[in-house]
Amino acid sequence: MLLVGFVVLVMAVAVLCIAEYSSLPGNVGRVLTQEEQAQVIADNSPLTDYVMLSPNADFPRDDDITKITIHHMAGNLSLEELGSRFSDRDRRASSNYAIDSDGNVALYVEEKNRAWTSSDRENDERAITIEVANDEADGDWHVSDAAYDALVELCVDICKRNGIVEFTYTGDESGTLTTHRMFNPDTICPGPYLNGKLPALAREVNARL
């Protein structure tokens, strides 16, 4: 009887796993053709330089996009390296976009889908999440000027396409600009340097909306 119960349990888990994988969009977790990549970029930010769509997401998101949430990579990863990490189902992590230290932009989860980024489902249902590379480790977790400038450009683009008419930084989760540390007391993400730039980021973005 115990053996039968164990077999039934294993079969149930297998069915759930198969259902989870079969529910993924066909363009997720693989290298896209040029035509597929062009279509994905057309449906998201035209600033995108690299695409590797992660399976670690909810398809689609349940809420309208009303926020942008900033994170740091806690390292100077390439877009390909971060994409490889986000392709690992065991990590259960992803972001919508990332920016490397040269200012290049990657798309890992399409905007219509919820990335698993901020330790808060409610926020991520409403937010486009962006990881920014650090060109210096520890300390202030500095980010390059190129990465910061690209962040401004990407935030402007996201706001314009999604009808965010005012980009507000309030220092808490009530603003349209939020950060990882607002939802997880155990992290300093996005680091002291970038966190200190957020009021200026909001002003620069608003000046262009």
Region roles according to the model:
Residues 1-124:
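N-terminal catalytic cores of peptidoglycan-degrading enzymes
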Residues 56, 82, 94, 116, ...:
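Second-shell loop/turn segments in exported
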Residues 76, 136, 185:
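Feature marks short, surface-exposed loop/turn motifs that line or immediately flank catalytic pockets
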Residues 84, 106-116, 136-140, 168-175:
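Noncatalytic linker/hinge segments flanking ATPase motor cores
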Residues 97, 130, 151:
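Divalent metal-coordination and catalytic microenvironments
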Residues 128-137, 182:
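Cell-envelope and extracellular/periplasmic
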